[in-house]
Amino acid sequence: MQQDKHPDYRPVVFRDRGAGYAFLTRSTATSDQTIVWDDGETYPVVEVEISSESHPFYTGKARTVDSEGRVARFERRYGAGEGQDTGEAG
């Protein structure tokens, strides 16, 4: 088996900037920043913008898109087939 072929897979802390939430997992991600975790060990920390603690889908604050309402508004605005040429002769 070849050495140095695969990236280093080690424990890493991911920290959500907005929610202040951090979790320890294993990853190949690298970082110069470190953090002392609850177990007293020092791990590299990777800052993320969105995690399960701040994403609207997981927090229950998701917006549902009313696609039927959008179609109805389009048809009101541009007409629902009124006066359109169907391409039939005669």
Curated annotation (Swiss-Prot):
The gene is rpmE2-1. This is Large ribosomal subunit protein bL31B-1. It comes from Streptomyces coelicolor (strain ATCC BAA-471 / A3(2) / M145). GO terms for cellular component: ribonucleoprotein complex; ribosome. Keywords: Ribonucleoprotein, Ribosomal protein. Part of the 50S ribosomal subunit. GO terms for molecular function: structural constituent of ribosome. Pfam families: Ribosomal_L31. The lineage of its organism: Bacteria, Bacillati, Actinomycetota, Actinomycetes, Kitasatosporales. One of its GO terms (biological process) is translation. It comes from the Bacteria. SUPFAM superfamilies: L28p-like. Belongs to the bacterial ribosomal protein bL31 family. Type B subfamily. InterPro entries: Ribosomal_bL28/bL31-like_sf, Ribosomal_bL31, Ribosomal_bL31_B, Ribosomal_bL31_sf.
